[in-house]
Curated annotation (Swiss-Prot):
SMART domains found in the cross-reference section: PX (SM00312)
Gene3D superfamilies in alphabetical order: Phox-like domain
InterPro entries associated with the record: PX_dom, PX_dom_sf, Ypt35_PX
Membrane topology: Peripheral membrane protein
One Pfam family of this chain: PX
Keywords, sorted A to Z: Endosome, Membrane, Vacuole
Subcellular location: Endosome membrane; Vacuole membrane
Domain PX: 34-168
Predominant subcellular localization, coarse grouping: membrane
GO biological process: protein localization to endosome; protein localization to membrane
Any Gene Ontology CC annotation: vacuolar membrane
Domain notes: The PX domain binds phosphatidylinositol 3-phosphate (PtdIns(3)P) which is necessary for peripheral membrane localization.
Protein name as annotated: Endosomal/vacuolar adapter protein YPT35
């Protein structure tokens, strides 16, 4: 029987601001739903079968607009948990779908195989983990703010964030 150990990092959300622009812009997920904010925080270090890795908490704050019977905006928060490799997979899916025509944001550096022997030390270093969290936060926010990427890959990004296309329908029926 394997034991699991979790260590929590304190969340330190960052906000991506576009240079010279109005940062109050909302990004449409579907007709009745807009992303207010996305942030990566709360990295949990987990041990399973002698392998250590970090799972990142990705929080998507949405505003769902309901028109009938009365116009109202409902805040909604969706939380998903992702490993670095899942961010990497999302980036690869975006690149394969849109090609090299659009510049896809970079991810923070990987731990390469020749450094793997040091991985457990790196993976427990709070400074290194905070830098990685900031890089992942920066990556996902740049993806969301890139209209070319979102026009082509909204389905993939929404699935990654745990946002389904019927989120406003689910909320309206509650």
């Amino acid at each position: 029987m394997s034991t699991r150990k979790l260590n929590m990092l304190t969340p330190e959300p960052i906000h991506l601001l576009e240079e010279g622009g109005d940062n109050s812009e909302e990004f449409v997920v579907d007709e009745g739903c807009q992303v207010q904010r996305i942030y990566v925080g709360d990295g949990s270090i987990t041990t399973s079968d002698e392998a250590k890795f970090t799972i990142w908490k990705v929080t998507t704050e949405l505003i769902v607009h309901k028109v009938e019977p009365v116009r109202v905006s409902i805040p909604l928060e969706i939380v998903s948990y992702r490993r670095y490799s899942e961010f990497d997979q999302l980036r690869a899916e975006i690149i394969s779908k849109i090609g090299k025509n659009v510049q896809v944001p970079e991810l923070p550096p990987k731990v390469y195989w020749y450094d793997y022997w040091r991985f457990s030390k790196i993976n427990l270093n709070r400074h290194w983990l905070n830098k990685r969290r900031q890089g992942l936060d920066n990556f996902i926010n740049k993806i969301i703010k890139n209209k070319d990427i979102m026009e082509s890959c909204a389905k993939e990004v929404n699935e990654f964030l745990g946002v389904s296309s019927d989120v406003s329908t689910r909320t309206n029926s509650e």
